Amino acid sequence: VLLAGIHAETAMEEPTMLLRGKGINYDTGFFPGGRSSRESFDPDVVRRELQIIADDLHCTAVRISGGVPARLTVAADHAAAAGLQVWFAPFPCELTTAQLLPYFVDCAERAEDLRVRGADVVLVIGCELSLFAAGFIPGQDADARIANLSSPNPQLWATLGEVFGRMNAFLAETAATVRKQFGGRLTYASGTWEQIDWTPFDIVAVDAYRDAGNAANYRQELRGHFAHGKPVVATEFGCCTYRGAADRGGMGWTIIDNNAEPPRLNGDYQRDEGEQVTYLRELLEIFEQEGVDSAFWFTFASYDLPYRPGPRDDLDMAAYGVVRVLEQGHGSAYPDMGWEPKESFHALAAAYTG
């Protein structure tokens, strides 16, 4: 992640994009720690947002992510109708391996139905399962597992080889099973700490956040993924909307105090939309230079983190979205939508043009 101090409020000339897939994540709702990331799911809003992603953000691909297969199907249909390549990405939370296999089979059948109707579909069988599934890294839920992995626990780290051995066996079994239902390309959205055997997959996919801890070696880490001889894709990259968020990368959201009612920020932070813009431009340049096939900004909207005027109450500071979600009413840029574009919206659109 990165040290972003430049505020890009003025337009910069964007380089010609060399990425094959110019993408963004689109959340249909998932349930980490039992919390829903998206309560409301209106198919008409979904259709409109995916058309905006195609027409105004100039994306060529979208990763449709979430925990409810029926929602994934609705959004994927609208994405395909908008002309986007669909990365059908079920994101289950707290399921055991016994529960995950039939869940992924159901999703594979849904993805195949869309594919045989002419859409370009990639199936992504899960995301960072070591944290979000039950039974790999110890912990009663995703929050506890994230805390365990983030702590200096030598005993836990000593067991990770065995953990990833079991996880790779499960992924291999799942890949073989879903290929009976799905005839397109297959991958898995991995965390950078996960030691994945990519043999069963067609694409190497990594949630490629840069932060202060890996900034010095970020390019080298990225290059390591090409050793498998398969296309490399950044299934997630992004940062939050406050000064210093780039240094926290994929953990920037942890400034929220979820024990407060209602939730609010846990300290004093300075809202900074330029932080996202700098991070976006720097990582896209790296992806182009290193030959990454496709990249998906995380995310279009953080529906559960609305913008509020008070600095401690502005949950959008902890959001990765390129739009700020409004608690009430509609925006002015898109009067039919309940959000306003952020600076990163316009920066992404400019970068993906051409």
Could you describe each region identified by the protein language model?
Residues 20-26, 60-64, 86-89, 121-125, ...:
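Hydrophobic faces of well-ordered beta-strands that scaffold small-molecule active sites
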Residues 109-164, 188-193, 296:
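Active-site groove signature of glycoside hydrolases
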Residues 139-162, 247-270, 318-327:
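A solvent-exposed, charged loop/short amphipathic helix patch at secondary-structure junctions
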Residues 25, 297-354:
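Aromatic-rich peripheral "rim/lid" segments of glycoside hydrolase catalytic domains that contact
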Residues 165, 180, 184-186, 191-265, ...:
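Glycoside hydrolase catalytic-domain groove-lining segments
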Residues 35-53, 100-111, 190-194, 277-284:
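Short, acidic/polar
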Residues 49-105, 163-184:
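Aromatic-lined substrate-binding rim segments of carbohydrate-active enzymes
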Residues 14-74:
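Active-site-adjacent substrate/metal-binding segments within catalytic domains
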